[in-house]
Amino acid sequence: MARGPGDTDMDEASADAAIPSSTPNPTVAFRCTHALSGHTKAVAAVKFSPDGSLLASGSADRTVALWDAATGARVNTLAGHSCGVSDVAWNPNGRYLATAADDHSLKLWDAETGACLRTLTGHTNYVFCCNFDGAAGHLLASGSFDETLRLWDVRSGRCLREVPAHSDPVTSAAFSYDGSMVVTSSLDGLIRLWDTQTGHCLKTLFDRDSPPVSFAAFTPNAKYVLCNTLDGRAKLWDYAAGRTRRTYAGGHVNTQFCISSGFLGGSSSASFDLGCSMVVTGSEDGSLAAYDISTGHVVGRGAAAAAAAEGGGDEGSAAAAAAGGVAGGHTAAVLSVNVHPSAPLVATGGHHPDNSVRVWAASRTEPAAA
């Protein structure tokens, strides 16, 4: 397998390869507050708006739904793609939304009016992922099954750069917070960092076994990259040092689908105290898992529907109805996870036939006495 420029073999640095998978008692409970129905096929992407007032969900049913994040009311539906929607992204001021779809295109939408403002074409296969730069919001990155990364000027609709990024479908494309770098992941098992201005590859990261990488994103401070791989693991990479810092496993199942992750309890949600910063990821068993970002321990779970019905999962899910929430959970794989920008809330999207969007409230719990 060709590695490309800036290669770094991660086999040399695996000090954290084996870590305990769970604490004796979870310290974070997830209570489902809203179960949002309306999509007729799998929900591939969920994203809170930058101010947290809206939640966008993109589905294989070709539509994007906009929900009031506080009430769960559906406030708009964006329709126009001729195939399923794989990803959604908000620009930094929350006025505009981008969508990536299997019809080989991206669309830009006015989130207030629901009008389609522009269609971006050029990819020659499914467009799987998209993200705005977090600075000015003028750049949009997209990744495709055509194995390329594209950078777009959303003001003109012009493709600024086409990068032959990988040798298999690109599963994620995300900017660093200042927009200077883009990280991509692929089913070819590689994570690559790119210079936004030049399009040059700055670093290629890979494991010895190179499992397919289904998701990658920078941490909020852009010092690390979080990724999900199709061997049931999530990993935190120190890309400058060329090594993994932490591996998260044992709390979620992920061998088939591209599942996203997020950060909870850190700088992006500093208005509450959950006791630790966490990596939150979906699972193919229909649950939601939270890991302590520093130790790798499983610190909480949002129960799948079957587990909740049997009294399993965390106490917050099992007691949701009594606490004013929604009993149960997803009945199929959780494909998408997104964390609210300022509140202890996590949104999730379910695979077919679940097809639902759920919002979970996270709260700290006291471990039971031994």
Curated annotation (Swiss-Prot):
WD repeats lie at residues 38-77, 80-119, 122-162, 165-204, 208-247, 262-301, 329-370. SUPFAM superfamilies: WD40 repeat-like (SSF50978). It is found in: Nucleus. It holds the Pfam family Beta-prop_WDR5. Disruption phenotype: Loss of monomethylated, an increase of dimethylated and a decrease of trimethylated 'Lys-4' histone H3, and defects in epigenetic silencing. GO terms for cellular component: nucleus; transferase complex. The keyword Nucleus applies. Residues 1-22 are annotated as: Disordered. Its main location: nucleus. Belongs to the WD repeat WDR5/wds family. Part of a complex involved in 'Lys-4' histone H3 methylation. This is Protein Mut11. It comes from Chlamydomonas reinhardtii.
